[in-house]
Amino acid sequence: MTRREMVVTTASTLAWLSSARLTGAEPVLKNMGGEGPGFANRSRAGGFDIVERCHDLGLGVVRVNVPQGGPDAVRGLRKKLDTYGMRCIVSVAPPRTDAAVAAYETSIAAARELGAVTTHASVTQRRYEEFDTFEAFKTSFEAHKKSVERAEPILRKHQVKLAIENHKGWRAAEHAAWVKQIGSEYVGVCYDFGNNIALCEDPAETYRLLAPLTLYVSFKDMAVAPYEEGFLLSEMALGEGILDIPGMVKGLQQRDPNMIFALEMITREPLRIPVFTKKYWATFDDSYSPLPGRDLARVLEIVRTTKKPLTTTAGLSPADALKLEDDLINRSIAYARKHLSL
């Protein structure tokens, strides 16, 4: 079956799933949420409200930004969340300068007013694309550390937490060491299940290091495939990739029975991870930020031995890409209902 045929044949399934939710046939997944990047095609189509969409899908949590419009807008969003019985995670970046501290505190106060379970920050880009030298990477990492130092007293004052995402900027060992060094109950990890594969980490090792520090999960399955300069990395519907989704979820729930798993099923072309290029290795240093050869070998073994068809939008119109996005999200939610206790 071609991708286009798959998109067309899923239309009736999507309609059934939507109607089932709207008629109350399925219970709310109180510990499963949605994040904006997973709805990118729907957002581009216009008229998108992430709270309404997550509610319609039967998700009990949503990641939002602080609304524009001041206190009235914040109160309006809180009222909507309360009406739907939903919780929220609020994206607020730590202050990069002393001059930004006051605005950051205003945003943290708004997050508290919204009843945020935690705030969220993904402050890095893909390090192998962003930086050409190790020195530039180190300067950036030290600046991010300083920004969280500025943020922590404000978080403590308002009793609001910050979950720092592993966003292809730091390997798990350095990320975990940093969070432990901060030593604050208000600073932890937003654990993205897939991102560190791009930094040549076995998902089991990422889990071992980040799970004990996790405040919430950016939830997805993943798959890999070879290409001439390295490997391709793609988000997949839950249960259709290479990750041990049931095992990872169970382990995190043993640590926190109310752990939130916010779905981020991004429907796009696979990412290119160019591990066979000189630029990829420019930011790794043997002592400050090591990437041992055995880790590269392990990831390449995973690439060689796992055969999964990757998510792709190549050749799809915007309308068909949106249909594929809806299908992948709905398949993920159906999997969670059947196999996970969320």
Label each region the model flagged.
Residues E35-L57, V61:
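N-terminal targeting signals for Sec/Tat export/insertion, comprising classic cleavable signal peptides
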Residues R44, A121, R127-E130, A225-E229:
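Short acidic/His/Gly/Ser-rich catalytic and metal-binding motifs that mark active-site loops
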Residues K30-P37, V62-V64, C88-V92, T119-A121, ...:
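Hydrophobic faces of well-ordered beta-strands that scaffold small-molecule active sites
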Residues V7-W16, E26-N31, A45-E52, A172-Y186, ...:
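Histidine-acidic metal/acid-base catalytic patches
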Residues M1-E5:
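Twin-arginine (Tat) signal peptide motif
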Residues W16-R21, V61, D82-C88, R96-G188:
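Active-site acidic/histidine proton-transfer and metal-coordination neighborhood
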Residues E26-P27, V51-D56, G70-I89, E105-A116, ...:
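Acidic (Asp/Glu)-rich catalytic clusters
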Residues A40-R44, V64-V74, P94-A102, E129, ...:
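Acidic-and-aromatic substrate-binding clefts and catalytic sites of carbohydrate-active enzymes
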